[in-house]
Amino acid sequence: MGIAKMTNKLSLLLQKPYVHHQLSVAELVEKVLHRNEGRLTHTGAVAVTTGKYTGRSPKDKYIVEEPSTKQNIDWGTVNQPMAPETFQKLYDKVLDYLMKKDELFVFKGFAGADPKARLPIQVVNEFAWHNLFVHQLFIRPSAEELADHEPQFTVICAPNFKADPAVDGTRSEAFIIISFEQRTVLIGGTEYAGEMKKSIFSVMNYLLPEQGILPMHCSANVGQEGDVALFFGLSGTGKTTLSTDPKRRLIGDDEHGWSSRGIFNIEGGCYAKCINLSREKEPQIFDAIGFGAVLENVILHDATRVPDYDDGTLTENTRAAYPLQAIKNIVDPSVAGHPSTIVFLTADAFGVLPPISKLTREQAMYHFLSGYTSKLAGTERGVTEPEATFSTCFGAPFLPRPAVEYAEMLGQKIAEHNVRVFLVNTGWTGGPYGVGSRMKLAYTRAMVQAAVEGELDNVETVQDPIFGLAIPAHVPGVPDDVLRPQNTWADKQAYEQKAKELAEKFRANFQKFAHIDPSIEKLGGPLV
C-alpha cells in the first residue's frame, strides 16, 4: 500500500459521522465519564488507569526502514528497524479495526511553540481520555490556525488493538512504530499515554536537526532580566524541582528546541511525576491539577475522590497531564532567547562527583554524550550497591540520529553563544549510598541560583584530581567543605578508590563513541 492509498484510507475513516473532531476540554471530560474511561477527582481532574502498561515500552518501539531515512538513523536496540511491508499490513489492520468503532476522537495541533519551526500534527484516538491528554499536552491551535491546519504528521493510537507477534512481526501485543515517509506514528496494545507524547518528541528529534535546530530533553526557565537557563537530567535528578523557581518563569518542563532565534518549548503542557506529590513540596504542580487535567494511575479515596499521591500501588510512575497555562509563573508563548546557562543534573550515588563544577566546552560535550546518573538497584532486596546509568544526551530512548550529531550541535551553540555550563550532583555526599547522605536540597538550590545568576563566573576554582572538573572554591550559602567531595569522606582512601571506579565506568561507556573527535575525551573526560 503506497502513501496515497494510506492517506485515502485515513481520510475515509476521518469522514465517518462517529468521528469527533476538536472537542473542547469540557466535552472530552463528559465523554470520558459517559464511556466509563475514568473518574472525576474533587478538583475536576480525570483519573484513569492504564492497565498493565504503566510506563513506556522501549522494546516495542520501531522505526520503519525506508530509503529516504535509512542512512540517517542510528539503528540498534533503541531504534529497531521494521520492514515497510510489515508496517503497512499492520497499519491496514489497525484502520480496519478503527472503522468498526462507535466513536473516535481527533485532535489537531502543533509540536513546537516557534511558528517557524513547528510541526502541525493530528492525533486519532480510540479513547476519549487519550484525546483529552493530547489536547492538554500539545499546542492547541487558535480558530484561525485550525482553519489553515494541514497535518504533517499523524498519530494513530488504538490501545485495544493487540498485535499478534507471530503474524504482525512485533515483539509483543504492544507496538509504537514511526514511519517518516508515511508521516505516521502507529500505536497499539498499550494504554500508557506517554507513548504519544514521546513518539512526537522522537519525530522532532529527527526532523529539527535538518533545520539546524537542536532538540533537547530538558526543562527551561527565564529570569527577570530575560536570561534563559536549561536543565538536563535523567529521571530523579531534580530537573522539575530545580527548574521550578518562584523568581523565574517556566518555559517548559521536558522538551525544547534551540534554533538560531533562541529556545522554544516543543509542547503546550506538562506531564509531571506525582508520586508523593504535596502542596508543600511542589505547589505549582499540585495546584495545576484542576478541571480537565489527566491523572494516570493515581489512586483516589472512594468517597471523597481526593487523590492519594503517596499510594504507589499501581506504579511509582504516577503522572499528571495539564496545560502550561495551569501554572501561574510561565512564559506564554513558550519562546525565549538563547540560554546563558546550562545545568547538567546527575544523582551520583557513589558520592564522588563534586556538588557543582564548571565545564569547558569539551567537558560539556563529554558529559552530554555520557548522560550519567546512578540508580539504586534492588534496594528492596537489601542490595544497596548503586548502579551507574548512562543515557546518551540525557535522552537516549528518543534519539533517532547518532548521538554525536546532537553533541556537535550543542558544542557549536555553546561556543557561538558563550554559554556557561555546570555539572550539578544532586546525589550523595560524605560517602556512597548507605554511608553518606543525600545532598541537601537547600545547598543544591543555592548552587544552582549562584550558577544561573552569574555569581560563579569569576570565582576561584580548584581542579578535581580524578575527573578534571573545575570546582568553585566558594558558593554563597554553601559550606566550603561540602564543595570538595574528598573533604566530606571520613576515609580518604575509600573516596579515591570509589572515584577511580566511577571514572573507569565513564571510560568504558565512552568507548561506543569511537568516531568522535578524540580531543573531546582527552580534554573532557576523567584524568585518571
UniProtKB/Swiss-Prot annotation:
Keyword set, alphabetical order: ATP-binding, Cytoplasm, Decarboxylase, Gluconeogenesis, Lyase, Manganese, Metal-binding, Nucleotide-binding
Catalytic activities: oxaloacetate + ATP = phosphoenolpyruvate + ADP + CO2
Listed Pfam families: PEPCK_ATP (PF01293)
InterPro entries to which the protein is assigned, alphabetical: PEP_carboxykinase_ATP, PEP_carboxykinase_C, PEP_carboxykinase_N
Binding site for Mn(2+): K198, H217, D254
GO annotation terms (biological process): gluconeogenesis
UniProt-annotated binding residues for ATP: K198, H217, G233, L234, S235, G236, T237, G238, K239, T240, T241, E282, R319, T444
Any GO molecular function: ATP binding
Cofactor binding summary note: Binds 1 Mn(2+) ion per subunit.
Known cofactor(s): Mn(2+)
Pathway: Carbohydrate biosynthesis; gluconeogenesis
Sites where the protein binds substrate: R56, Y192, K198, R319
CC per GO annotation: cytosol
Subcellular location: Cytoplasm
Role this protein plays: Involved in the gluconeogenesis. Catalyzes the conversion of oxaloacetate (OAA) to phosphoenolpyruvate (PEP) through direct phosphoryl transfer between the nucleoside triphosphate and OAA.
Family: Belongs to the phosphoenolpyruvate carboxykinase (ATP) family.
Xref: HAMAP family: PEPCK_ATP
Protein name, UniProt field: Phosphoenolpyruvate carboxykinase (ATP)
Lineage: Bacteria, Bacillati, Bacillota, Bacilli, Bacillales
